[in-house]
Amino acid sequence: MNKTCARCQKVVYPIEELKCLDKTWHKTCFKCTECGMTLNMKTYKGYNKMPYCEAHIPKAKATAIADTPELKRIAENTKIQSNVKYHADFEKAKGKFTQVADDPETLRIKQNTKHISNVAYHGDLEKKAAMEKQRGSAEVSDSSNESEYFSEQLAAEQFSQYAPTASPIPPAATTLHQQQQQLQHQQQQQYQQHQQQLQQQQHQHQHYLQQQQQTLPPPPIQHQQYNTAAITPTYQQLQQQQQQQQQQRAQQQQLHDPYAHYQQPQALRQQQQQQQQQQQQLLQQQAIKQASHLYPTATSQQQQMPPPQSPANPQQQALNSYNEMRSAILQNSHHPSGNSVDQYDQPQQQQHQPQQQSTNPTLVAAQQQQSHHSLLNNNASNGGISHSHHSNINNNGHGSQNQMLPPQMRRSAASVVAYDGNSKQQVAAGPGAAQNHLQQLYASPNYAAVTPSENSINVKQHASNGHMPNQQQQHVAGGSNIGKIADYDPLTDGPRVVPNAGRSSTTLVYSSEPRGNQGGNSVYPKRIGSVSDIDPANGIYGSLTAAEQAHQQQKHQQYYQQVQMMQQQEHPPQQQQMRQQPSYSSLQEKQSRQSTAMRVYRAIYDYEAQDVDEVSFREGDVIFEVESIDSGWMTGRVERTGKTGMLPANYVEQAVI
């Protein structure tokens, strides 16, 4: 079938056929619709599937419309996405500069250029130049003279090694040498002044110590030693002060004259070093003398120790006891191991021993043990016992024997022996009872734990005409051997009981002990079972034994019988005959209802109802008529609101009534 031309409607043969704009044309018929100019495939413009030339093609005219935010957004997106702006900038930049990829070298040059331009812009170079000009010209001239002299002096020293004659010192060198001598003279004066100040301080300190020795009674040598050690500077502190002074002098010399070391001849430098060494040796000898004077040796301590004087009056006695306690505290504070020996305790113990041996020979051992105990526990943190109890004497002349006992014995004696203030007679349960009580106290290897507060309590028992029985004193003296850790043998002694364990700190959940061993310790009537025995409706989450269940059933039956008797008394006998007896099943139902009615629970958490058939309650609410309906759920009536519904079993616990 032959095709027809879109313009002339004639047959188009293949030789002159032209296909364009979805139509078939003769080559001569393919012309502009407006002007009739012949077109080809390169010059035509199509509009409405008709050919037009460039000049006559219909063009869209701009129409004024309202500018809305949506149109603005679209125009902005179009501008960003199109390449029109990029091409326009590219065309403008042609011939002006060339774009180059950034590399590290280019970036470094760019950064340096930026710094240079900033410095030039802010005028930092001019500011630095002005500051340099404002500095003193004298310093600049001095530095130049020093540099010139430094170079000349080095050359002269090198030449003097080979030539016998010495080069004359230039005038600048003479002035510098004079300045150096002046500095040395000033430093020597400062050093002498410092030495004089140190001597004055030492003299004042010695004068102060002499005044103290004249006014106060002679304290122990160790006490004086520790006090002076805290006041006077030690040998190490003197060495540190000397080193600091030498460093300061060296820094001053370097600041005033940095080239002084090279300007001095070698002989002069050696003399200065020898002088410094001699001064250091003198200072060390002085410090050693002071230390030996302030810290005497053991032999000098023994020579200087005054003999113990017997107290003449009560005031001197109290003062001596105070000094003894103070020296013992200081001694134990410097000897933390507790192996020190109290100097002033031994003569007093020797004075007390013959008196007590004449009255009661068995009490001497207790007194010796007490003195050893007081030496070991003399610090304030251990609840120490003051030594002043040696001077406490009652009316009969006997020492207060209860105070010479260890703290445990003192408390036991205080609990057994009592004194009546009115009759002033000793009231006790008898020597046998006291002895039994003390035997119970010291029978077990574990003593009662003694806290520092209990140990520091001074139990004073004064009697005008009485003292402790001899049997009790003998037992106290014999049973005061406190055990050590080394004496404990775990194989033979067995486990020890923890002292002062009033109650166990943990709650027993599962135990292998039988029911009878627990006794009255168990609060709830339950036995220890496994996790599978847990019943949420059982209240205390533990299965009851068969005997307890039978006991509860018996109680329920008795309660049911009582209710039935009351009902029979209320109703006439005719109605009782007409009424049928309840069956066994109905009796069981009533019994179960009564058991649930008797079961009372208390809420341990707040709960909000999540469904219609649930009930809300608050912590502490009482819940009655509880029945277990499912695993973890039960029904009950809240007493506060009166509502009945389902509630979670783990939110409540059985109330103990």
Swiss-Prot record:
Domain SH3: 596-657
Comp. bias intervals (Low complexity): 172-215, 236-254, 342-357, 371-403, 549-586
Protein name: LIM and SH3 domain protein Lasp
Organism listed in the record: Drosophila melanogaster
Presence of the UniProt keyword Metal-binding in the record: yes
PROSITE patterns the UniProt entry points to: LIM_DOMAIN_1 (PS00478), LIM_DOMAIN_2 (PS50023), NEBULIN (PS51216), SH3 (PS50002)
Subunit structure and binding partners: Interacts with osk.
A Pfam cross-reference name: LIM
